[in-house]
Amino acid sequence: MARSKIALIGAGQIGGTLAHLAGLKELGDVVLFDIVDGVPQGKALDIAESAPVDGFDAKYSGASDYSAIAGADVVIVTAGVPRKPGMSRDDLIGINLKVMEAVGAGIKEHAPNAFVICITNPLDAMVWALQKFSGLPTNKVVGMAGVLDSARFRHFLAEEFGVSVEDVTAFVLGGHGDDMVPLTRYSTVAGVPLTDLVKLGWTTQEKLDAMVERTRKGGGEIVNLLKTGSAFYAPASSAIAMAESYLRDKKRVLPCAAYLAGEYGVDGLYVGVPVVIGENGVERVLEVTFNEDEKAMFEKSVGAVKGLIAACQGINDKLA
């Protein structure tokens, strides 16, 4: 049986980490693509030379021509520029929209049957644009946000409670940004909701609120520490979890930026919600009930996504 093929568009820090993780988890053969010739080839060779030590047989290649992604089963997109100091949101959108247009055309021509995971920011707008530009079915194009945001929340909670991260579940919905919605009512330690743990004296509401806020600002915290870049280990791990659920038909329930067609009262947008990922891509959207506060937070988050989409449509009339 042929190995799966994973195409990574963008061979920067996240792309290289994705390539290494795909090998370690034996998900398939990997092609790294980047417009800067030499970088994907160099990283591919470096990782291939680590394979004898780690004991995996995946084939690695690098390319700067989209024909190399032909027939990919999974495509993970990290191409684009990060937001730099002094750059406005619209500047970032304008640059990365052009990138998504080129990437979308490449996927449409060479890997139209792939499951596509977008990581490029601003995420909720870029995954929406990528689906439009590629013309792929909405269930085969998703954005990586919620898995990462939930992982950050789980890390903070596990540290606070002094328990294993394995026993902490966290629920983060909405857009990937300051308006994300960490739902404490649906987040648990060994099945016990966080709201109950506050009542039991394990933590205080103030500490819980601080962890929620730290989760919202999680990406920025790392940017401020690194000074020359942004997070790449946790984002790569998060995207690999999504790819693995698709390739192995695990049907994991993962929070992702998924296309909504009426669910949660949202139509035609990509918003972070829990979904089942299996061999058919996004197979189901899980709808949870909100209380009034959660509903207001979610609607605010959706409003922010709508603003990003409007900005995209103002920049590129093909998206209008």
Swiss-Prot record:
Residue sites binding substrate per the record: 83, 89, 121, 152
Catalysed reactions, as listed in the record: (S)-malate + NAD(+) = oxaloacetate + NADH + H(+)
EC top class, as a word: oxidoreductase
GO molecular function, one term: L-malate dehydrogenase (NAD+) activity
Catalytic machinery residues: 176 (proton acceptor)
Keyword Oxidoreductase on entry: yes
Gene3D superfamilies: Lactate dehydrogenase/glycoside hydrolase, family 4, C-terminal (3.90.110.10), NAD(P)-binding Rossmann-like Domain (3.40.50.720)
One of the protein's GO biological processes: lactate metabolic process
UniProt keyword list: NAD, Oxidoreductase, Tricarboxylic acid cycle
Tagged with keyword Oxidoreductase: yes
Residues the record lists as binding NAD(+): 10-15, 34, 96, 119-121
A Pfam short name: Ldh_1_N
SUPFAM superfamilies, per database record: LDH C-terminal domain-like, NAD(P)-binding Rossmann-fold domains
The EC number(s) this enzyme carries: 1.1.1.37
NCBIfam families xrefs: MalateDH_bact, PRK06223.1
Family: Belongs to the LDH/MDH superfamily. MDH type 3 family.
Chain's role: Catalyzes the reversible oxidation of malate to oxaloacetate.
Protein's recorded name: Malate dehydrogenase
